[in-house]
Amino acid sequence: MNGNPELPTDTADQHWNKIWNNLEKGSKWLMPEPDVERWAKGLKAGSAILDLGAGVGRHALALNSAGFDVAALDAAPGGLAEINRAGPEVETKLGRMDQLPFTDACFDHVLSWNVIYHGDETIVLNTISEVRRVLKPGGTFLLTMLSKRRLRIDQKNLNGPREISRNTWVFDENSSDKIHPHYYCDAIEMLCLFQGFEVLWMEDREHEKPGSWHWHLILERRA
C-alpha cells in the first residue's frame, strides 16, 4: 500500500460536481431508486429525513413531494444548486459527510444512496458515527455500500488498481469517479462498521450495470 495519510480521501465530490454542472435532461441521476420509494412508503407522514449525499436531489425532491420534511446535504455545490431551483422548500446544506452540520437526534430517518463508501475506512467510520448521532433512536438508515464482488470485477476491467489503505482502492480512470478512493467490503467487514445499529434488511446485488455489486441495507439506530 502506498497511501499518504496526510492526503484527503473523500474527494469524489470533485468528479460529481462536474457531472452535476453538465447534467442532461432525462438523466438517470434525476430518477429516484425503487428501493428508496418502497422504503419511504413505510415511513410516517411528515417524518424528518436527511438525504446524505443528495446529488441533484432525485430522492430529496421525491421525498419532499411525498410529504416528508427533507434536508439535503452534499459536498458538491452544483447538485445543491439544482435542488434549490427545483424544490426551494428542501433545506440544502453544503458540507462533508463525516462532519454533519446538524444537531443530535434531529432526524427520524437517513438515506444515503451510493455515497458513504467514497473515502477510506476512517471516513466511512466517522460518517457512520455522524449518522448515528443525528438519527433518533429507533430511526432507520437506508444505504448502499460497495461489495467486494464488485472489487474483483473492477480490478479486472479498470486501469491501475491500487489499494491505498485497508479496503480502499483507486484506479487510473480519469473519466470516472474511480480515480478517487472507494471503500469495498465483504459482509463480515461491513457489519463490523455499523456499531450501534440493528440490521433490518441486507442484500448484495447488482445495479443496472452487470457486475455493479452493491450492498443494500436498512438499519435501525439502537438507543
Model-derived segments and spans:
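A short His-aromatic
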Residues: Y117-G119
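A short glycine-rich, Lys/Arg-flanked "PGG" loop and its adjoining helix->strand segment in the class I
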Residues: L125-P137
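Class I (Rossmann-like) S-adenosyl-L-methionine-dependent methyltransferase catalytic domain
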Residues: M1-K44, V56-Q99, L142-A223
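A short beta-strand submotif of the Rossmann-like class I SAM-dependent methyltransferase core
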Residues: S112-V115
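Conserved beta-strand/loop positions that form the S-adenosyl-L-methionine
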Residues: L52
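A short acidic, Gly/Pro-enriched loop at the edge of an enzyme's catalytic core
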Residues: D98-V110
